[in-house]
């Protein structure tokens, strides 16, 4: 451990690997809500946060576990398509609360092109929230529909049926053939859209009002 008069003990949350204060400061300076994406071994969650002196206030949030309980999701809780759908759900809820713009907070995740963090970002963008980003870092449509998993499952089923059963046991137990995953993603997305169709209608109405005023 460092010693001497110039040594500074890092703040507790930085020591615990929870907060990058330098990055947090830059995000707070933007004056916009932060879209935070956090990932565990089983699930992931997306929050839209407002920075306050007493602590962050959650404006809107979504957890991938909700996809299973409320919208019939049968896939994994923390893969790329789950990240996209969770970001989409959180984005609609943010719009419902009046959040039109935000900045992405990746936390201590390493920003990797096409990763789950950016899949969640793509979901929020598709919901209608404006978030500064580069198109290059977003995963493609085929990726967030998990077509790569479906193709791998189809090939594995032909090559090694036993390994296929083990690898995709959770999907199969829930009644989903992994080869049908892209279509299932669309089904769940439509279920989310149906639950929050009033948000899309209100957002469209606001857009028309702005155009008239302009």
Curated annotation (Swiss-Prot):
Which is one GO molecular function term here? structural constituent of ribosome
Which GO cellular component terms, listed alphabetically, does the Swiss-Prot or TrEMBL entry include? Answer: cytosolic large ribosomal subunit
Which CDD domains does UniProt cross-reference here? Ribosomal_L18_L5e (cd00432)
Matches recorded under InterPro entries: Rbsml_uL18_euk
Which keywords, in A-to-Z order, does the entry hold? Ribonucleoprotein, Ribosomal protein, RNA-binding, rRNA-binding
BP-aspect Gene Ontology terms: ribosomal large subunit assembly; translation
Q: Among its keywords, does the record have NAD?
A: no
**What domain of life?**
Archaea
Pfam families per record: Ribosomal_L5e
Oligomeric state and partners?
Part of the 50S ribosomal subunit. Contacts the 5S and 23S rRNAs.
> What exactly does this protein do?
This is one of the proteins that bind and probably mediate the attachment of the 5S RNA into the large ribosomal subunit, where it forms part of the central protuberance.
Q: Which family does it belong to?
A: Belongs to the universal ribosomal protein uL18 family.
Record-given protein name? Large ribosomal subunit protein uL18
The organism's lineage is:
Archaea, Thermoproteota, Thermoprotei, Desulfurococcales, Desulfurococcaceae
């Amino acid at each position: 451990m460092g010693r001497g008069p110039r040594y500074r003990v890092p703040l507790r949350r930085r020591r615990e690997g929870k907060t990058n204060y330098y990055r947090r400061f830059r995000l707070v300076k933007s004056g916009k809500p932060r879209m935070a994406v956090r990932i565990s071994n089983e699930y992931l969650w997306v929050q839209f946060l407002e920075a306050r002196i007493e602590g962050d206030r959650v404006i809107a949030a979504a957890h991938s576990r909700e996809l299973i309980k409320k919208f019939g999701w049968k896939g994994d809780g923390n893969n790329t398509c789950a990240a996209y759908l969770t970001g989409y759900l959180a984005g609609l809820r943010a719009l419902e609360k009046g959040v039109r713009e935000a900045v992405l907070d990746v936390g201590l995740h390493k920003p990797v092109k096409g990763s789950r963090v950016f899949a969640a970002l793509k979901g929020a963008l598709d919901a209608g929230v404006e978030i500064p980003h580069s198109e290059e870092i977003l995963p493609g449509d085929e990726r967030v529909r998990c077509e790569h998993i479906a193709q791998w499952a189809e090939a594995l089923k032909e090559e090694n049926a036993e390994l296929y059963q083990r690898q995709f046991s959770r999907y199969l137990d829930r009644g989903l053939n992994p080869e049908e995953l892209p279509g299932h993603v669309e089904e769940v997305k439509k279920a989310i859209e149906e639950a929050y169709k009033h948000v899309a209608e209100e957002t469209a109405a606001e857009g028309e009002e702005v155009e008239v005023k302009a």
